[in-house]
């Protein structure tokens, strides 16, 4: 069995929204994480399978784009599409469509498959690894890295039990909340009212009880 995509319908609830009844970035990422997990579970790619093959998928980069504000009570259709790896990177693109069939938001995530025993990146699909997603290419965001010319200390964040996943790592969706929490004062300072892009460049996993130091860019230069 092979499916290029998987879809489900969701309703945006109040607890997923901010003070202005807008769906938060973290809430949308949680929904994207859930539909991606469900898609993998259909083909047997669950926690037990990864453990038996000593493998794990780690998120290396993720980009979220809101085409417009998504409000409480809206019904969305999520469509997720994974692809074959390109240079050891596995892409998964997920779209959120409104009831008029227009794309309200999209998420481009990039993953790497690692050997949990040797801690090495597996640049090719292992022979004994069942990977059912055969699409060669999916849509993607222009995820260019941004070099900051000047940085200012924005704060520090400690991980806690309620925010870690089954691997003891900070849950990927929590990075969105952290970004908004420490970035909003700088957005107000720069008189930016609405930021449709939420770029989360995840370079390493944060383990439980570890601290991360956050720096906010004052001037950006694309590289």
Q: Where are these predicted regions, by residue range?
A:
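Hot-dog-fold acyl-thioester-processing enzymes
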Residues: 1-59, 106-108, 115-193
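HotDog/MaoC-like acyl-thioester-processing domains
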Residues: 2-8, 63-146, 201, 205-212, ...
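Short, well-ordered coil↔helix boundary/capping segments
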Residues: 169-173, 199, 205-207
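Phosphate-/nucleic-acid-contacting segments
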Residues: 196
